[in-house]
Amino acid sequence: MHPDLGPLCTLLYVTLTILCSSVSSDLAPYFTSEPLSAVQKLGGPVVLHCSAQPVTTRISWLHNGKTLDGNLEHVKIHQGTLTILSLNSSLLGYYQCLANNSIGAIVSGPATVSVAVLGDFGSSTKHVITAEEKSAGFIGCRVPESNPKAEVRYKIRGKWLEHSTENYLILPSGNLQILNVSLEDKGSYKCAAYNPVTHQLKVEPIGRKLLVSRPSSDDVHILHPTHSQALAVLSRSPVTLECVVSGVPAPQVYWLKDGQDIAPGSNWRRLYSHLATDSVDPADSGNYSCMAGNKSGDVKYVTYMVNVLEHASISKGLQDQIVSLGATVHFTCDVHGNPAPNCTWFHNAQPIHPSARHLTAGNGLKISGVTVEDVGMYQCVADNGIGFMHSTGRLEIENDGGFKPVIITAPVSAKVADGDFVTLSCNASGLPVPVIRWYDSHGLITSHPSQVLRSKSRKSQLSRPEGLNLEPVYFVLSQAGASSLHIQAVTQEHAGKYICEAANEHGTTQAEASLMVVPFETNTKAETVTLPDAAQNDDRSKRDGSETGLLSSFPVKVHPSAVESAPEKNASGISVPDAPIILSPPQTHTPDTYNLVWRAGKDGGLPINAYFVKYRKLDDGVGMLGSWHTVRVPGSENELHLAELEPSSLYEVLMVARSAAGEGQPAMLTFRTSKEKTASSKNTQASSPPVGIPKYPVVSEAANNNFGVVLTDSSRHSGVPEAPDRPTISTASETSVYVTWIPRANGGSPITAFKVEYKRMRTSNWLVAAEDIPPSKLSVEVRSLEPGSTYKFRVIAINHYGESFRSSASRPYQVVGFPNRFSSRPITGPHIAYTEAVSDTQIMLKWTYIPSSNNNTPIQGFYIYYRPTDSDNDSDYKRDVVEGSKQWHMIGHLQPETSYDIKMQCFNEGGESEFSNVMICETKVKRVPGASEYPVKDLSTPPNSLGSGGNVGPATSPARSSDMLYLIVGCVLGVMVLILMVFIAMCLWKNRQQNTIQKYDPPGYLYQGSDMNGQMVDYTTLSGASQINGNVHGGFLTNGGLSSGYSHLHHKVPNAVNGIVNGSLNGGLYSGHSNSLTRTHVDFEHPHHLVNGGGMYTAVPQIDPLECVNCRNCRNNNRCFTKTNSTFSSSPPPVVPVVAPYPQDGLEMKPLSHVKVPVCLTSAVPDCGQLPEESVKDNVEPVPTQRTCCQDIVNDVSSDGSEDPAEFSRGQEGMINLRIPDHLQLAKSCVWEGDSCAHSETEINIVSWNALILPPVPEGCAEKTMWSPPGIPLDSPTEVLQQPRET
């Protein structure tokens, strides 16, 4: 059985912690990196870095030898980083980093912060230069003063030369050498200087003109330098000794050092006629001569006196010394350098002033009568203006019983704003190591590192429940010989004096500092601001005790004894629990509930008794804060159901774990509820479970709608906070903005600070705008922004584990106004790429502008000029002004159908550029009122356009808006739907009418009159209809309601009769039914079938063969039908009024005069077939003698009877009745053609009728042969079918 190793591990951990703390406390501070000098333009940011060891070392900063106040405007200090947000003249100078711990303090070398400048070119005295062809040419340039060194460029014949080429060599001095002059090199040359920090480019106002001449002689000339030069160069830097020599042929050039040839293999090398080295050494100092000669023995030379400068160095530094009290100490520091460096002595980062006990002689320091105050760190700093070097040494006193404490670094008084984060530091040394305590106006400050400072107002004390003894707790971090007092959110109650006391067994020492707290509105620190008044009042009320921070409302009782014994608990391995780890996502799918799920952090050695959860609503739209709601959850639970929340709202949650050791660090979360659902769905929601019922913490993977937040894995916890929401930007002043954000989950550790970064558009670097922003502030003011520039901002949250991810960058924000760094006018103008007339009074144009064409010179905007093309007067030009960020413009108030000239310029404070290309565009023709309006081409607005009045932007565009487009589409669709509805209604009405017709007059049904034994048909030709008084014998439809002049009988007739027009013999076609059609038309599928007028078709009943002789009256219209499934019936034949089809098989129809003829039906009818020729010669052609074909027809019918025999029956009084069923498959017809009988057989699906040509009847025979069926008076009107006249 293994023994319990828990106590052993705890004891080992505590021992190692004590040893490490002791070792760290005995280590002297030293720098691992020191700040470097920087050059920046005014208004630009500067960042200095410094780091030191051991980890207990604290870093502060000095400016020009004085302690730098971290609350200065435009200055931010965070650990070892110093950030100057906006450089101004008061912040120029040298900066030093100061590192201190319990052993002592040391100071770094100075880092100079200077402003970048670029001077102006001086006047040039020589404007025309002559160079010989095939020789060397030299263009001198007096480079203006610049910090840092300017880059030299040349503009040669209008083209820029930035780097050396094969024929052009830009020398380090800024001069230009032409290696081999030719005639092509003549022209103008201008020198320019470019500052890489300010990005300024200055060109000399008057350049030089190069003339190329023929070689005149073989003389040798040294064009540069013209006289000897003294040159001081820095050790280990590149050097070029220039020597430009001309002559034809090219002279020989060689170099001497101190009168001797330069040995080959040295650091020097030849560069054309120059002498160069990449790294010069101190041994390279001396005199260098450039010798040039030709074949004729002409020699010329020039001399350089080179002095190599060396950085300050220390060959022998300080040594640590341990002496007894009252002894004498000597420190020696051997320094070297060119020029000779000066040596400065420091004790604990403070300059040592000569005194009776402190003497400086040469490079040594002598201290007489050492006392306790002399212990600490000593420094020797060597500086010769080229560089610096320092050496440190420690002075200790022998351990002969120890000595009283000495405060090495005292706390510094500060003036801060309400709500700021304040840190007071104090370091002391002594033997044994002293214990440091803090006091305020109320006495000793007792605290625990895990607790935060809270208000001490009597109101808050009285508002607490009885028995709750909650002492004000400060956040104090103490180590051996060092202590820091932190106040996370300072208030007016914290103002006053604070005393740092260091004590050991030999005595005590004190140092004090004053803390002044001012309201934020009068704060001189301009970078940090509070939220709106509502948020400030809320924070102040919390500080007053109604809702005092996170822990003030928790039922916590902190006894002084527990606070005093806190270090012992830490020593025994017991501490307060860590912050809970929240697993819930930052959003919920329900509008009024949220499940908060977490898991416990480290319990600190004691079980967690309870969790305290506080939540409130955040109105992220206006920055309003709701009131806190506090819930206590048993320590065994890991889930809390929050109910009665507001939909679509942002909530903030703070929770801590409590054990017997106290409350741990708070965990923070922000979540958003979903949108409100419908009333029906909301009523069906399950009721909220009671608080305290444990649940399994399950996070649905389907929750993908996280509002842009990246969820961390719930199975692990990174510790760093989540990225804040995207910040919002609002205007504070002309050159400053407010950056406001909303934090999210703190990752299990409280957020200690925020950091805001900014980026100027068209640059790639993010810079720090503000850091060390207290967590109580969710807004910051960023100042000194450049007018006219566009910026983006992002926010970072910081806690004990580190920095969060960067938030999403804000939307671009453009600072109003124009930059103040315009130095010259732009040269090249924009290019108009496109013009279009969008209406009769407006023209739209687009252009492109390339900043690099003007050396990236900023512009303020564009001038757009336009005038009618037919005008030659420049005063007719009108001008529109457009912002520099625009890429298109709409010119308005133009004349219709007029051509315009359009040109542009870009401008800034320096002036206007050259004109762009000229475009000609003509406006459209003015529309006539009431004319159709054609849609105008849609104009897309560029993303960066910000319509700002005038005719710029989409507000004045003539293109249809989306609302007008929707209106047009809606109207078109409405008209289409209306047309469709009318069409459907017409189809339904027509279908209903057809159904009505088919109901009474089925197409394939032949009506059989029960009382009909025969029929009379009046046949009227179209041409003869008017011969009988313009009238017909009776009406066609209803009681003569259709006059003879009505000639359109309209109905569908497919090649034959397809329907029967209803009616009765007594005013209609058949009795018992009235006509429902006021106008009945007959349509023909083949309109050309109506030939030579119309005709009447009728069903001809088949007669017995014995009576075929009486069929002669039928002439050519005898027709034999075979009807399948027919039966004999006594019913009379049907009456069928039809229209003549197109003549087929030789059948021809002839128009007849209006006559009344009998239909040959029985043998009892007298023979009226022989008619006088003169009676019919005007109407009908003579009919040849016929012989009956009825027998053949009957035989044909009988022969086909096996297949589908037709049945015939003889009716009463000799009537032959033919009954035709609904489906007729075969019809056989026989017609006379001359003396022969032609048979035709046609297979159809409906009854087929042929024209019945009736012969004329004499007047005497007409009345005798008139037949009337029983029950019908003879004076009844006869039904007549009048055919349409064909045109």
Swiss-Prot record:
Name assigned to this protein: Cell adhesion molecule-related/down-regulated by oncogenes
UniProt entry tagged with the keyword Nuclease: no
Modification after translation (UniProt): N-glycosylated.
Residue stretches making up the Fibronectin type-III domain: 579-677, 723-821, 826-926
Location(s) in or outside the cell: Cell membrane
GO biological process: anterior/posterior pattern specification; cell adhesion; cell fate specification; cell-cell adhesion; central nervous system neuron differentiation; cerebral cortex development; embryonic body morphogenesis; embryonic retina morphogenesis in camera-type eye
Disease: Holoprosencephaly 11: A structural anomaly of the brain, in which the developing forebrain fails to correctly separate into right and left hemispheres. Holoprosencephaly is genetically heterogeneous and associated with several distinct facies and phenotypic variability.
Compositional bias annotation for Basic and acidic residues: 537-546
Protein topology in the membrane: Single-pass membrane protein
Cellular component GO terms, alphabetical: plasma membrane
Function: Component of a cell-surface receptor complex that mediates cell-cell interactions between muscle precursor cells. Promotes differentiation of myogenic cells.
Residues making up the signal peptide according to the UniProt record: 1-25
Region (Disordered): 531-553, 933-955, 1268-1287
TM helices/strands, residue ranges: 964-984
SUPFAM superfamilies assigned to the protein according to its UniProt record, in alphabetical order: Fibronectin type III (SSF49265), Immunoglobulin (SSF48726)
Record domain Ig-like C2-type: where: 29-114, 120-204, 225-303, 310-396, 405-516
Regions of this protein lying in the Extracellular compartment: 26-963
